[in-house]
Amino acid sequence: MRDHTKLKAFKLADEMAVLIYEITKSFPKNEIYGLTSQMRRSVVSVPSNIVEGCARESQSEYLRFLEIAFGSLRELHYQFTLASRLGYVEKSRISECETKITETEKVLSTLIRSLRKY
């Protein structure tokens, strides 16, 4: 079994989850079951799928869960962009979040590509 806590992709995804939860606290109340909920589900899905993949025995299952995590990450990226365009994200936090999301995408996609070679 792989140790997810040693993966940079997991660490970044975990930090990103905390960041998105903090940011969505200030979203309009009418979005609690809309964009707020969607973003929170997406962001929690990323590290959760990394953890689940690490618990799988086969390399192919591990890779499949990392790919699911990446899909959730791309979904979150769009949702964050939409929330920013709607004015829900404080301007001072946009760059910080954008950087964290993009960095996580790069690290996770690199991990996925390296596993596909084997």
Give short role names for the model-derived ranges.
Residues 1-118:
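Short, C-terminally biased terminal segments at protein or domain edges
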